[in-house]
Amino acid sequence: MARERIRSRIDRRNFLTGVAVAGAAGTATTIMPQGAAASATTAPLTDPAARPSALPPTAKMAAAETGTPQEIKRDNGTPGSDFMVDVIKTLDIKYLPCNPASSFRALHESLIDYGGNKSPEFLTCLHEESAVGMAHGYFKAAGKPLLTLCHGTVGLQHAAMGIYNAWCDRVPVLVVGGNDLDAAHRPPGVPTFHSAQDINALVRDFTKWDDTPVSAQHFAQSFVRMYKIATTPPYGPVMMSLDAGLQQEPIRENGEKLYIPRFVPSSPPQGDSGAVKEAARLLANAERPVIVVDRAARTPNGIKLLVELAEALQAPVVDQGGRMNFPKTHYLNRPPNVIGQADVIIGMELSDFWGVVNGFIDNGDHGIGFNESKIKAGTKLISINSVELITKSNYQDFQRFQVVDVSMPADAEATLPALIEAVKAAIPNDRKAAIAQRGEAIRKAYTDGRANVRRNAAIAWDASPVSTARLVMELWAQIKDLDWSLVASEGNVSFWPNRLWPMEQHHHWLGRSGGYGVGYGAPASVGAALANRDLGRFSVSIQSDGDLMYAPGVLWTAARHKIPLLAVMHNNRGYHQEVMHVQRLANFRNRVVNLGNDMSPLGTSIENPDIEYHKLAESMGWWAKGPIKDPADLAPAIRQAVAVVKSGQPALLNVWTQPR
């Protein structure tokens, strides 16, 4: 109602109809609204009431607003952007999170008018990094990629961090960047500032493929190709530069019939049969085999396959959490310290195999610390990792080089069936009793470990600000009977959800950001919640305070598009990772760290003033409550918030927490 009242009072064209325009040869005199001239002759300009509140429009501006648009002779052919929409629709892309811009105005108009704003539906974002982050989170919940559009040089630079996260996290995101390529025809001024000869170069180091189509048919081929490349393991973001002129150019009848290539998915690469057989031999004859996984389970079936392999070997599984790889309730789920006793280690889709088997001790000299091996001499190492197929050189996401004994540049999930069959065939009959006995020992260690985790979680249970373990368990108590999905939670709450919640299904945990870029959590949560809304799941995120402030506008997007999400703030009022870095260096240098007037080293705290995240969320259309500092207030607040989210709205709780 408020919006309607405002529109009845203020209208740009009605406002400008009273503007008096005078001048000759392009020269404009002072322009005032009707009735202002008479008062201006009697009131001195030094009188504040007589001064205009804003600069009046120029004659040119007024004419542009009130005049009749110039008649432009147009070709009656089909707009090229309409055909582009036809291409996009063949791939069943459900949503398009995007910040609007002129370099893809033709495609935008075709999507919402010709395409009916369906498949894809345009989702208004307030920042390009939010748009890419939403697509990132959506894929991990739905298993299907989204398309996003970026505006030239400036929009793509905004999006770059989100694209890098997707690259490191092996997630397909389809990015199309609008660009005014033809210097002879591009508009002068701002559009030229926002153009480049090769905008794809901005992100080429961390995209799987890119192209710049020069015709409508070229677009059709390249768009289907980019979708195919992005969705073939190893997954990754892809990029297309799309000329604004090409979008607006009509399709003329010149005898050449346009066609849309049919999409046929590629099968993922599988491990060589000889390498699979050798890996199975090593595992079947090992005394203490260990399985380490990071992004091995691409789908729910990947979890089942990993359970089958682990049970065949009675081998402990170390899940590094890039995806939900292995049930937390399974007795073979074990912490990383089991690596030290291993004689054979198989790593599947690991981000950092070197870091799995080696330690790095920070001695205060960055990049010089001490290295130490975590494994016994002679331990055999097996790697199945599809990322070897797309390794690049500039960005160092491939980590340190680790020598292994068997290396398969292949998709782990696709290779698992053959590996399981080979392992079962390779286990000698006289080893089966020892393998079963090994499993019983691991089962006891699992039971003891769970009890120890629960004891540790009880420490500072009644503390204020709230302990992160208390926060996590109070949250669990309210969502445990729902079909829940933890859509985002970096390791900043001491991994309590992964340690305490009975995570068993693929959607229970969607992993982390990949590139560890701050600002991922909120957009990815909203994107995943969008997917879960359509799947009937309840979405919850544990939202870091500093992370939210990188892209808070995504809260508005969630409210605007009715995306239900429960965001519980981990509001420790600081960048605690950096708190520890500065404190560590001060300790090394035998100094007392300078806190100023804050609780943390200068430059690391987010306080004085404290950000009222609940009010921020309320201003963007969320139900919100806070600040919550007393743990006794948590349960009723979470109960309220859960009810709000179940009704279809987003809700945020601003909880003051301990640092970790």
Regions picked out by a protein language model, each given a short descriptive name:
Residues 1-10:
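N-terminal secretory signal peptides
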Residues 140, 293-390, 503-535, 550-553, ...:
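Glycine-rich, anion-gripping cofactor-binding loops and their flanking helix/strand elements
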Residues 31-81, 85:
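C-terminal segment of N-terminal export signals and the immediately downstream linker at the start
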Residues 69, 197, 225, 229-285, ...:
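Conformationally flexible catalytic loops at phosphate/diphosphate-handling active centers
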Residues 51-75, 214-217, 241, 255, ...:
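Phosphate/pyrophosphate-binding active-site segments
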Residues 185-194, 339-341, 416, 496-659:
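Thiamine diphosphate
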Residues 81-84, 89, 107-112, 441-531:
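Active-site diphosphate/adenylate-binding microenvironment
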Residues 178-220, 319-442:
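Glycine-rich, acidic loop regions that bind phosphate or pyrophosphate groups
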